Amino acid sequence: MIVEGAWWDFVDDIAANLVGALLLDYRESMRPVMEAWIDDPDRWRRRAAILSQLRHKERTDAEMLFDFCRRRAHETEFFIRKAIGWALREYSKTDPEAVAAFLRAEGDALSGLSRREAAKHL
């Protein structure tokens, strides 16, 4: 579903709601899927992996979120850069100190778009 006929609005809804819910309920079995998606050649799977925890708030696996952002920091693809910033911005509403620390440590590797989006609420 994510790859076939995909566009950002379709992918974002599935990632944040369906995939995100599955990740919460089946974290151990979904983790390998997300690990595969973050390195997938398809940009929509990579975007879905980044956005999969968008609504998790205090249940966010920050280690996974930050790892995925690091692994895709080199991306030139707009939709991935935007997803990184959005995911970090949303998590900053729950744990601003963690996101600020991540940006201090890794911010130079991120695109300007990702950094700006991530820092909007800091």
For the regions a language model picked out, list residue spans one by one.
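Alpha-helical scaffold domains
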Residues: M1-L122
